[in-house]
A protein has these predicted regions:
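Short loop->beta transition adjacent to catalytic acidic/histidine clusters or analogous donor-positioning motifs
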Residues: 55-58, 78-89, 110-111
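Short beta-strand/loop segment that forms part of the nucleotide-sugar
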Residues: 61, 85-95, 144
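Short beta-strand-to-loop acidic/aromatic patch adjacent to the donor-nucleotide binding site
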Residues: 138-149
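N-proximal low-complexity "stem/linker" segments adjacent to membrane-targeting elements
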Residues: 2-76
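A conserved acidic beta->alpha catalytic loop
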Residues: 92-101, 148
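Residue-level signal for alpha-helix termini/capping positions
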Residues: 78, 82, 104, 134-135, ...
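Acceptor/aglycone-binding surface of glycosyltransferases and processive sugar-polymer synthases
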Residues: 112, 116-135, 152-229
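Donor nucleotide-sugar binding loop of glycosyltransferases
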Residues: 66-69, 95, 122, 151
């Protein structure tokens, strides 16, 4: 089945906006028969906690030594009742600060805690999370960093767009209505005027914030043969 992909963008502190321009038409397969798990490059990981699947969507949170930041993020998500919409799964990159003790996570309705054991950093953590989510049949995945810089209120809107048939949603700090906090000037310049324009030119899609990790993916996108997990 073919899907029209629109590039969605968002304000990370309260309001999500969507670019009205339609992008290229991309065909993603819905059938699970195309999944070839043997080709996935998944780092070794331990499943430290898994309470089972409750929802069709999950929120993946990559974390490493975030201390109070991850606690504050989980508290915000609890107040927003995110766990009523999606299963919350944390992917730990090897924290040593005690911020992810199981006893302290219970109050935040966390469904799973994965610990990456193999090589790699953030991208390796995310691959662990993607593989786990796909193995457990989730139809959509939202990723949000564990540093409490992104606004979890937008998770509800990301999920709504997945339900409407969108395959990829990404937040942006650099569009009208967007806002970034504590982004170094050199980093912002590099993203806005070097990385995003180069990626836009190479891909044929309009990117405004190519490094923002607050995203959502449909299952059919992640299992498509054109996507390398």
């Amino acid at each position: 089945m073919d899907y029209w992909i629109r590039y969605p963008v968002g304000d990370l502190r309260g309001h999500t906006y969507y670019d009205a321009r339609w992008m290229s038409k991309i065909s993603f397969r819905e059938s699970n028969s195309s999944v070839d798990r043997e080709k996935w490059q998944i780092p070794e990981m331990d499943i430290t906690m898994w309470l089972g699947k409750q929802h069709s969507f999950c929120v993946l949170i990559p974390v490493i030594n975030e201390g109070k930041r991850i606690t504050n993020l989980l508290q915000r998500m609890k107040l927003l009742q995110v766990s009523e919409l999606a299963d919350i799964i944390i992917i730990d990159g090897g924290s040593t600060d005690g911020s992810l003790e199981l006893e302290s996570l219970n109050e935040f309705n966390i469904r799973g805690l994965l610990v990456k054991k193999g090589f790699g950093k953030l991208s390796a953590q995310l691959r662990c999370g993607y593989a786990f989510a796909l193995d457990h049949g989730y139809t959509g995945i939202v990723t949000i960093d564990g540093n409490n810089k992104d606004d979890p209120e937008a998770i509800r809107r990301f999920i709504k767009k997945l339900e409407e048939g969108f395959d990829f949603i990404q937040g942006s700090r650099f569009i009208h209505g967007g806002k970034g906090e504590n982004t170094p000037i050199l980093r912002e310049f590099s993203i806005r005027f070097i990385h995003a324009p180069c990626l836009s030119f190479a891909s044929g899609f309009k990117w405004t914030d190519s490094t923002q990790g607050f995203r959502a993916y449909s299952r059919k996108m992640l299992i498509d043969p054109k996507i390398a997990l």
